[in-house]
Design a protein with these regions (language model features):
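PLP-dependent aminotransferase-like
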Residues: 16, 33-90
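PLP-dependent aminotransferase class I/II
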Residues: 1, 146-167
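Short glycine/serine/threonine/alanine-rich loop segments
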Residues: 12, 60, 117
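Active-site pre-lysine segment of PLP-dependent enzymes
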Residues: 56, 74-83, 96-119, 123-156
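A general structural signal for well-ordered alpha-helical segments in protein cores
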Residues: 2-3, 27, 51, 74, ...
Length: 167
């Protein structure tokens, strides 16, 4: 079945994989599961538009971390974290800018956030990055409890109308 194939392909625990009606649905489910109106969630300035939309539906505050030259700034994300922060949404590689932050910066981000803050790592376009400095998120999900990785079949496999995402 599909979940077993995903688990085998990405070396993930099949019991931690969920399928959804595209990444959009999974982003909304995550926001609704973890956010209350008194919470905050961080997203990047030029990130995926579904992030602030999903946050706002919950009544939580969407906090923007400014990019630098259209590239995610880990320092700016870290500077926006406070006691109300519950989620950080990060698209890497980023849509719509096409930029990505290297593995070292992703690891620095994750090791610098409080353990009660969840990093939602949207790697929808990961197959397009052919560089050893990139991390697709599988390693983070296998190592840490506060990371959720999102992927989709729509982009790489030409299945946009199918709306099939997983996390």
């Amino acid at each position: 079945d599909l979940i077993n194939a995903i688990a085998d392909r990405y070396s993930l625990n099949k019991n931690k994989i969920i399928l959804g009606n595209g990444s959009d649905e999974l982003i909304s489910i995550i926001a609704q599961a973890f956010l209350e109106p008194e919470n905050e969630a961080i997203h990047t300035e030029y990130g995926f538009l579904q992030f602030p939309q999903a946050i706002s539906i919950t009544g939580a505050k969407a906090v923007v971390a400014k990019d630098i030259n259209f590239t995610v700034s880990v320092d700016n994300i870290l500077g926006r974290i406070n006691k109300k922060t519950k989620l950080i949404f990060l698209a890497n590689p980023n849509n719509p800018t096409g930029t990505y932050i290297p593995k070292e910066e992703v690891i620095r981000l994750h090791t610098s956030i409080p353990s009660n803050v969840i990093l939602v790592y949207d790697a929808a376009y990961s197959e397009y990055i052919k560089n050893d400095s990139y991390i697709d998120g599988s390693e983070l999900v296998n190592k840490f409890k506060n990371v959720i990785m999102l992927r989709t079949f729509s982009k790489l496999h030409g299945l946009a109308s199918l709306r099939l995402g997983w996390g």
